[in-house]
């Protein structure tokens, strides 16, 4: 694997955004003529709506440093190593926890589905977009999650947007962990319910909030199972006890728990043996299950209510045949090859021990998500760039992804990483960490 030299930022992206510069780049001249001497239309004034667009400069300021780390282009399958700019790079930023995105069995299943069903469903689940594949997948997921019923959505984001906004009405309360995923935040904003956010994974804070609410009010406690940036696990046994005491419902976002925690990778509630105490469990297919889409699992009556009232479901096209078939194949592999989850945890242990022994701060991580805290925005971008130059792809996380002062590099392990790859990445972390005085 060769070290990767990042592409230099273009001058167009790094220079200040001025009208005269736009004219210069496009061949315009101040006399109202273009480069050919013919007249052009006057540049219209900026509409009030778009003033925020023209004054936005955060991305340009980062580009100007030469450290802009977003929208990097990959020209290969998502695997333990990927190709960028024609060079191989070790991938430590993927959410493919079981390493299935490039599995030949899943690719064969998607090809077969396209050959039988075509490329899309051309409609919503509510109308003409329900395939027998969707029904089969919902049944298999209900069995895995030990719930009466499951409903598929086209993306994981849509699940949280649709479920929270539909379930929580104007007289209801939503109690949300402050570190919840953005999709849960947006679902709460879209709902008519009143939202109260409690300190991250703080059950005392949640207890105080619950005690302040009317006994007769509807209450939904919504949390991540595994928090996507911190890598810690919700204190679910304590949470469900509080929910019972205060007559509240519980919804767990298991996007980063499926394929990682619980029996056969079935998630956080299974991990803590409290499945019956969690009313709704959300999962996504874009991580361990090597596809795209999401689901909500719960009792049959609630799922039927969502089928007929959840607008992100009703007014979105259904999951494609290829995506659905990929999940079915991935579920089969996850059930029949438990050694994958075991290897994921072995890899996590090796990387975590290595990073800690080097002196890095990993916070309270308990999962294959390992946050390497820099607590500094510039150092986060510098660290990301230097690791890329050393042939390591990693994701930087700064505000608003985390609060200011909690900036980090997010390491995520895959079951298919080798110990050799992990050890090589640790060597790069040691080298760059010392350069930046982080260790």
How would you name each of these model-derived features?
Residues 1-38, 43, 104, 108-112, ...:
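PLP-dependent enzyme catalytic core of the Aspartate aminotransferase-like
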Residues 108, 112-156:
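Conserved N-terminal alpha-helix of the aminotransferase class I/II PLP-enzyme fold
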Residues 163-182:
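Conserved PLP-anchoring active-site segment centered on the Schiff-base-forming lysine
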Residues 196, 200-252:
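Active-site phosphate-binding strand-loop segment of PLP-dependent enzymes
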Residues 342-351, 356-391, 401, 406, ...:
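Conserved PLP-binding catalytic core of the aspartate aminotransferase-like
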